[in-house]
């Protein structure tokens, strides 16, 4: 028996490995794998069903068909194990070996491997330096190639057609060798001397001038070096021996009725064997050349089809006209090996059923149907029954369970006690899609689900199904209980806010409970405590909404951290006093002393979690739910048609709007306004009408007048059911009520433009046929959008997960002093996100000082929590430098301090947390809520009116940021710089508002002056761009020739004439050379210099500029010399929603990107060419940088203006690549974070910035080498930044020259494919290309990410698997240590020993 066990043990031992290498297989290697050559195309005998000898299923080669039984039946049973039968030649062993024994085919002529030939760039082509076209012509026997030119005029690897070959033969005889087919390519590949070629190219590289040639040589050099380093030989890309897959991996299954189901591979192998055998026969017969050639070509084609069907020519089809599935198809795509079997497997001990509500469950419970539980827990039940002695054998136990006797249910109850099960709802978009619960047995067939976890699962009870999984091992049960239990997942990982929040009925019930009603039954009564209030309510003395006075006892923490009761009489309502009974002690009463809608309840739970801990919060949440359901029932809020009250004002508003529209129509008919203007105005009118109606409706619905106790009328919130549902946040919104009781408003056409005639009716009045027809389009589009959106959103999530999957918290602190500077996010004067929300849960990078002093408020490396946020606000700190994922210096992974708080748990993040996947899920999960379409903007639907002034909202002090200005004659400031911003600072020194002010704005206040709320402090003309003079003097025209560079226009109404500069393109030859400008001179005619410089005041005028001055006119400082009309900003389609997020993460370059200044210096314009402007920037060092810019771009800069590197010089959307190159890592991170957040914010989705930063970090992990220094990198090579940093540290330690690099940004798809792990990349996309590249380079996968480890079937190096990997790494280091013991000093050894002992004691291994 022992022997047997030993034998079985050694069967499945896998070597303990640390990496996987992929390479090319040499013919000898293939033969060494093989157990014999397959000579016949036969599979099995159709009569006996036994495999044919030497065929594709041959038992002699691949192993026996039955366990321990040879084919002819001479040897059976275990005792003959290992014997080889002399009759049929089959080894007596397990039939399992048919899964791993390979065979081979000896090919009669060599064949090229299609992957290395056709997968672009063609590896064979690169090595031989021939085009793919030529190689294919040689391989498929269309032309000859010279392999040995000898003493002739021919070149090596020259292509010869049939005629040229014959001519050459006549001329040179057998001086030279030329071959065709794979033999020729094989000969050429064998002749390559890798080391020689590499050395030669390394020498040539520095001398090469042309960029394209250099790139080509670099590519070829990289490939050659890869071959040399990996030990692969180029000739192995041509095969002499073809391996054959083990037969059980390409099965042949007899169906009933004498037919067979077979894997496509067998067909493909049969073709290869047939052609190979035919070719052998032809070669033996010495057949004519042309026949042999044809047969060789067919062999090549059949091997191509076997390896990758359809890559070349038409795919080979089977009997059913479908292309056969080749080896390459087996591994790629969603149905391939990687995604179908390795990354996603089916599991046993699982069941699924419909879900229904379990309103009586506790949060940690779920209802499990008895039938299901019995089936799922069978093995446990059998075990228990045997242990109890109720059954003697498993068979008996089985019978008992099938009878379902009483004792079985008792045992089942015991078995499931405290044995958590996991519930999962597809689609699992984030980690809360699988949670653990304790099962409670129920009758019926539906799983009962606790209502509060529905938000996390995104589940509802309209027929959703869920799956149940049973964790079997004790470790699995422990993890399920400690990590996955629903009670441990109160906060959402995406934003750290509670996700266990009531919704719908519960909210409505609590809202109803905590509302007040004027003059309710029992108003004005006094009560001693909340229990007495409930008594009064139950006996019917007071109603729920009555306003009363009660003594309320709160518990407050004192200085020692003890709870102290504080009692006082409060004005409140009966319902709120009842609500107070379920609140745990330690909550402030103010939190529930208001009508509880969805937001206040969320705040309540959040407060409880942060201040009272997890256990209290969970119990409180359950109580809230029970209470909410109960009072929702009592309230009986239902909707009747009378609840939709149509406002009286609606009809007058509609009539007025109709009159206005008629007026505009009349103007249009007279030709006073254009069709476009009419359209926009009409749409504006109806939009505002709609707003007015809905405002009137809401005012009407939300308030009602009632008589109070004193007989006077008093206003109170309405008890209208529809209003209560919307106001509490239970269901519905103002927009939906508007359609029910206001007017439906404007509708969109199929192309997205808005129809001028609105739907004036609402649903209560009913729609006419035409109105109904107009509105159907939008409704259907919504459904179509949803379907597309789901797929797109899922694909985005998949890409995000793939790029971030290997990012794990690996150490506690990387010690960096870099970080991001956080300020409040301010848009158009509103604080969109205050500072506290941006720094909450982050770690301070440098000491935070109290503003205006040197006193330290927060020391470095402090984690900012809610309490510290209050401290920051009290001390009015307005910016903090915090640690960030982007600037973390850990090489592979990230440190806890740079990440900060674990949002789902509320404390510092633990080591081993898989933050990459969490980030990807947090960004991807709300993807389905984003819109799909790009917004076509029509009318006022959302067209921003051109802004022309700044009006402040807060009182404070005006501060100008990076602004240059002059003071004009009226003592106003005029801005003369491009990217100026104006901020309002409150008395605490905090920034409250921020506005962009364009060039030429006139300010009514000076820098540092006090402003009051409502002041207009800046004005400008939005439709023209002025040219402002910075000095006073007389205007002198330069190059302004009437009819050449300018024309005069006279305004018909005013009679004023103005000069318009003609566009350069429309001038004649002399005019093209002239550059019209305005020069300022003093009274004597001398040039005036710009203040403080030696630059004369000369202002160039671009085409279309309008000058309202005459030659010699006097101007003062800050006056406008000319105006450049701005084309009215066309309503650009803003790409919104999902496509925008995808564009940002894919780092796509926008269509017409903004042009940024490449260098810092002074701008000048050089000679213009056709269609382009030459821009010169003179740097402080005196160097001149020049760049050509298309004339179509409107430049924001004028001659002589200083610019800073990275400043915008032509407007447009900025390209992230430019921002990274010119401004650095932090600005590009900020840009992407803010742009992505903007999309999510529009939909009201909250995501923490950290998650987006994680993805950005993964996008900038590669860099391009600018100067290799003493490193082994090549110039222009793309390498992981971490690799360069490691190598640079080593080089610096040796005192050598480190490599210089420039950060590169890659889109997420590209970054995923460029990861160091080829297994991860291959399982993502483009499997063939990734594997081809990896094989040629002989890459080794170190199995560092999560995906690679899942694929090879290990614990992942994150979460609870993190320690396992740490331990393995430690053991490995320990195993390697003795090799270098000669250099260890005694002290070191002693220290190491103590460390080891201590760590053992700490980890409890004693």
From Swiss-Prot:
Enzyme Commission number(s): 2.7.7.6
InterPro entries for this protein: DNA-dir_RpoC_beta_prime, DNA-dir_RpoC_beta_prime_bact, RNA_pol_asu, RNA_pol_N, RNA_pol_Rpb1_1, RNA_pol_Rpb1_3, RNA_pol_Rpb1_3_sf, RNA_pol_Rpb1_4
UniProt keywords, alphabetically: DNA-directed RNA polymerase, Magnesium, Metal-binding, Nucleotidyltransferase, Transcription, Transferase, Zinc
GO cellular component, one term: DNA-directed RNA polymerase complex
Database matches in Gene3D superfamilies: 1.10.132.30, 1.10.150.390, 1.10.1790.20, 1.10.40.90, 2.40.40.20, 2.40.50.100, RNA polymerase II, clamp domain, RNA polymerase Rpb1, domain 3
Residue positions binding Zn(2+) 1: 70, 72, 85, 88
EC category: transferase
Keyword Nucleotidyltransferase included in the entry's annotation: yes
Recorded catalytic activity of this chain's protein: RNA(n) + a ribonucleoside 5'-triphosphate = RNA(n+1) + diphosphate
GO molecular function list: DNA binding; DNA-directed RNA polymerase activity; magnesium ion binding; zinc ion binding
Domain of life assignment: Bacteria
Cofactor list: Mg(2+); Zn(2+)
UniProt cross-references to SMART domains, sorted A to Z: RPOLA_N
Binding residue positions for Mg(2+): 460, 462, 464
Membrane-spanning segments: none
Amino-acid positions noted as binding Zn(2+) 2 in the UniProt annotation, renumbered to this chain: 814, 888, 895, 898
Comment on bound cofactor: Binds 1 Mg(2+) ion per subunit.
Any one biological process term the GO annotation gives: DNA-templated transcription
Family: Belongs to the RNA polymerase beta' chain family.
Subunit structure, interactors included: The RNAP catalytic core consists of 2 alpha, 1 beta, 1 beta' and 1 omega subunit. When a sigma factor is associated with the core the holoenzyme is formed, which can initiate transcription.
PANTHER family: DNA-DIRECTED RNA POLYMERASE, DNA-DIRECTED RNA POLYMERASE SUBUNIT BETA
Name of protein: DNA-directed RNA polymerase subunit beta'
Organism placement in taxonomy: Bacteria, Pseudomonadati, Pseudomonadota, Gammaproteobacteria, Alteromonadales
